[in-house]
Amino acid sequence: MDSTPAPMAAGVAPTSTTVTPSGTPSASPGTPAAPAVPAVAQDLKLTQYVDPMIGTDQVPPLVPDIANTAPEDLLGGFTTPAATMPAGMVQWGPDTPSVPNTWSPPGYHYSQTSITGFSLTHLSGVGCSAGGALPVFPTVAGQSGPAAFKHANETARPGYYGVTFDNGIRTELSATLRSGIARFVWPAGQRGQLNLAAKTNAASWGGSIAQDPNDPQALSGSMTGGSFCSSGQTYKIYFYARVDQPFTAKLGSGSAQLTFASSSGAPSTVNMKVGISYVSVKNAKDNLAGESGTQTFDQVAAQADATWNQALNAIQVTGGSAGNLKKFYTALYHVLLAPSVFSDANGDYLTMGGKTANAGKDRIHYTTFSSWDTYRSLMPLMAWLKPAAAGDMMQSLVDDAGTCGGAFPKWVEGNTSSDVMPGDNVPILVAQSYLYGATGFDAKKALSIMLDTASGAVTACKGVTALPGLAEYQKYGYLPADAFIQVDSSHSGGTASTTLEYATTDYAISRFAQALGDTVNAAKLLARSANWKNVINPAAPGSNGATLPRLSDRNSDGNWVANSFDEIEGNVEQYTWMVPFDIPGLMGVLGGDAAVVPRLDTFNAYLNAGSKSPHLWIGNEPAFATPWLYNWTSRPDKTQALVRRILDEQFTTAASGLPGNDDEGATSGWFVWAALGLYPEIPAVPGFTLTSPLFPHATIRLGNGKTLAIDTDHPGSIYVKNAALNGAPLTGTWIDFAQVSNGGAITFGLGDTPSAWGKSQAAR
């Protein structure tokens, strides 16, 4: 929790320690001894545990009695096995046909058995058309795609992707930050051919390809990208490509066909390098030269592996099963894919206004902000592990607001702002980042943007309204259903759940303002965050004619909408629990411990129920905080059991191993936190609610150079018997960020049956 107490309950459970007169915590009997805080350990070989195929297939079907689902519910993880770097601008990977008879965005789908090409840009885990820049397809004269393949002939690992088509043509891909490298091999006696198309998944028109007049083995051009989730906003992607073998070229309108000489006695190999830029062909060429240079394919792939291994060593977990190690490091890999680099090697980038700017010395401008999703899990982790990069990310958003109309953008892809999901969620990202240690950005300017948007002084970014219905929200204290407010580009309903989103943002801004010393606005927005109470119907219809308090849509006259059920990607029962910033207040409204615990038990009977069932849907972000709510009741052991069930059952090592869209690492971020036994439950209140860790030991290398060790005494057990921080007992289920921001040691004593740990009212 921030150092200045909030005027109302923040929803955190205080921790208890025994403190000696000198102020040094001391251990008590029955508490596991704290290990010495370790020195920075040597790097482990961690890329071996990453499987980029996890999440590339559809979510397994729901159980029959809750299978009345919406199409969204069975969407896959939508991850990509593309070769890329942490935060890479280039993600060079395979594309397949879409999945028949179901919605599936362009990209790679594990269930498909053919590949249409290898494009240089992808987004990981999103459910809208994106990426697909400059697809390259290796073939031979007289043949066209797609090409059949088998997964047995396919390999994906960090920074590398390889596949052999059934026709014998082999493709290998790797990447630097802003460029890609490919190695194509044709069977002996075949004349290899590469087909290139200057297009993206946003548009198949408007592209151009030309040979470099000064280098007959080089090509350059551009194509139109953007229009993410049908935003209509577009941009240009520029490329410069070079192959290491001579070719004859057939250039068309936005296409190129390169034909190479055959080799009669041995397979023929062509290496191709491509740099991209959102500014110019020259910058694309410079990106390629500066990052790839004269390196061979194997050298680039080795460097990518080394870079990924270093990034993954930010968290070292040991002692777990091979399956759990694979799940953990694949999740951490997915977390590190975005936000992604948008500025060139020289610092140039394309502003939201369409002009060229420069990020400045030693700074990077970022894009790919899935804000509605990632504020709940990814951004606190990024700020804790990589505060300098997270600071650049937040400065990127501040700069974006300055060139797009004054408000923060929403879903940022390239230099576009898409109106995909409801709420003004970037303020939560910014507040989370700052309060978890990423302070290297213009925080005062960020607060000014937040306050101007919250008051209505500024309203939009690139024509996308930040807070639709703000006037009604200010007047009524909620968004009235009969005002028919278009809360985002896809929804005109969901006013009750969107009210919760607005209140969450109000709370986050209030905590950010408090941290910056603006106590007046902190108090105002803290008071406004209590608007969540205005959409809790105290007598909503329940089963067997009974009533119960539950989220409901409400009209402007104050009356509740009859049979209120559907909300934004969820329903009223699922959203009733989404008040993470005032959990004690929510518990009180819902009837206290005696009412909440059995209701949560019923709610959690199913773990991934979809949007049409009044149960937990862990595959979608509004549910991320719900499994931890037992920690604010007399039964924290139920959080321990529930979180472990989710880790074991809903996340697997299969291609279908994610419970829903990964949304640029949001779902994977939840797994990382839960496996460590921590979760940043309360937006903009830095700290963690606790559960039993998945691994016997973890070492977290913090961004400030310190380390935090997390240890358990009985690996495999679920229930917490006792816990300690630096040897001092923890009797509660919450620790403040300040207690671990400079490292230390958390130890858990675990058992196979529930204990009394954390159950008392004082521990919450």
Task: Indicate residue ranges for each PLM-predicted region.
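ATP-dependent phospho-/nucleotidyl transfer catalytic cores
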Residues: 505
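Accessory carbohydrate-recognition regions in carbohydrate-active enzymes
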Residues: 35-379, 383-428, 434-500, 513-534, ...
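Active-site cradle of extracellular carbohydrate-active enzymes
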Residues: 542, 546
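Ser/Thr-rich, Pro/Gly/Ala-heavy low-complexity intrinsically disordered linkers and tails
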Residues: 2-39
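Extracellular attachment/recognition segments
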Residues: 719
